[in-house]
């Protein structure tokens, strides 16, 4: 599938036509969720954040809004929506949730569920200075081009695992964020 002329309608029909498949058994028990905010435009965008520099984990990294499930969350989707509101001021009622991708294990011990949602183009999002240093929009068509991601095999604690790397403007997109974007591309039928 060629992503260069990806429209929102095409993305939605492909995402809903091909249901996510579980690819592996997850190892982690702690639950987290992220929102993949697709901006409703004829040529859709993808909202991403850069985590604040002062954070203990993943400081300065490009990420989706999201975080750990807490006791007030009724579901993984509710957790993703709450975190998106806390981090970038996206009201939960403004998000049209279209589905979820299979959970991914993080290196920090969480089972992370990506929630795909459509958001209006005119939302006045703003970064929570406690958690986010920047909010930016990337064209979804570019984010879903598999050729932009390059593999790097990392050896950690005697184990090898592959991470994916890419750049968008001056933002370095890698790790779980790049992996989730690749999974989303594969989900809608982009060929490697």
Swiss-Prot record:
Residues 29-160 form the Nudix hydrolase domain. GO terms for biological process: nucleoside diphosphate metabolic process. Gene3D superfamilies: Nucleoside Triphosphate Pyrophosphohydrolase. Its cofactor is Mn(2+); Mg(2+). GO terms for molecular function: coenzyme A diphosphatase activity; magnesium ion binding; manganese ion binding. Its EC number is 3.6.1.-. A motif (Nudix box) lies at residues 67-89. Mg(2+) binds at residues 83, 87. Keywords: Hydrolase, Magnesium, Manganese, Metal-binding. PANTHER family: MITOCHONDRIAL COENZYME A DIPHOSPHATASE NUDT8, NUDIX HYDROLASE. Probably mediates the hydrolysis of some nucleoside diphosphate derivatives. Belongs to the Nudix hydrolase family. PCD1 subfamily. This is Uncharacterized Nudix hydrolase NudL. It comes from Salmonella typhimurium (strain LT2 / SGSC1412 / ATCC 700720).
């Amino acid at each position: 599938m060629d992503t260069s002329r990806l429209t929102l309608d095409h993305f939605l029909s492909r995402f809903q036509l091909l249901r996510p498949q579980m690819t592996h058994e997850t190892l982690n028990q702690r639950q987290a969720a992220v929102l993949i905010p697709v901006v409703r435009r004829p040529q859709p965008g993808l909202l991403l954040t850069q985590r604040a520099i002062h954070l203990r984990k993943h400081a300065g990294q490009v990420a989706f809004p999201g975080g750990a499930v807490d006791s007030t969350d009724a579901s993984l989707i509710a957790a993703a929506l709450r975190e998106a509101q806390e981090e970038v001021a996206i009201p939960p009622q403004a998000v049209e949730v279209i589905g979820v991708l299979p959970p991914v294990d993080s290196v920090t011990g969480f089972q992370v569920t990506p929630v795909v949602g459509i958001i209006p183009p005119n939302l006045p999002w703003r970064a929570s200075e406690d958690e986010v240093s920047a909010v930016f929009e990337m064209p979804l068509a570019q984010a879903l081009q598999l050729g932009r991601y390059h593999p790097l095999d990392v050896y950690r604690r005697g184990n090898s695992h592959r991470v994916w790397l890419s750049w968008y403007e001056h933002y370095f997109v890698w790790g779980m964020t790049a992996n989730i974007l690749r999974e989303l591309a594969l989900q809608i039928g982009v060929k490697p």
